[in-house]
């Protein structure tokens, strides 16, 4: 039995804690909280011990706090750093390394520059075994994770037949729970986005990926518009869809009209947190014209990295074989059943 501490209880931390508490191979030490808000009582009501920074403990006197984050880290085998983005490097240097504890970092951190948290950016579809023996690993962001689920199967099947990937990432403005963030009436563009460099970090620096990124006023998922250019005539749509038919965490939807409709369907089917935890290829938007495949897929920004974190834990803590790790994650997340339900709900009209 391994002891895991979730350092942070936001969009990622709250979800991950809820799922891995049912893992018979893991004991959840507790969750870390940095602000004395309603989420503290939420965590306690769900049965989690709450730990806070030693220097802030007086701010939490109205709550039943278990102890300090420093003590929780010291008693753990692995920490999932789900603290506010950009604090991972400081936590690594001040908390995790001094206490010789393994750590997983989230997509708000970096694998570049002086404050890189790791030399490995994890994507279970690409580099699962490379996490064996690693002490510090960064889990890719929702967009970066999603691109791996699409690009890697294409690369495996078509290889050098593919000349380039050209993508437009349409990012959501804020997550569902981030009610403190206003969603303004504007569209923003992102110069020099990190997403392309992150994908190339795990797929290889010569990956011919070229991205443009915009942010739009919605809380309902990301959308990727991906054009794949081939040396010769592009494959037919049916061939592309067949490639993803049995792909883990990728659903093919025919009749969805928007991202909120997918989220609403997930809620109606009682999916935890209204998350699908996957990529959704919008089959009615798939075109093959000349040498180019034009596809569009939505990315469940709050849910897609949660099973990825769990798979990464198994690589770091147990060095499990790939198939065994995925089967264990499936036993908690039921991704195959969610995929089946979504594909039936948004099936092609006959």
Where are the predicted features?
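C-terminal substrate-binding/catalytic lobe of Rossmann-fold NAD(P)-dependent oxidoreductases
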Residues: 14-67, 161-171, 175-301
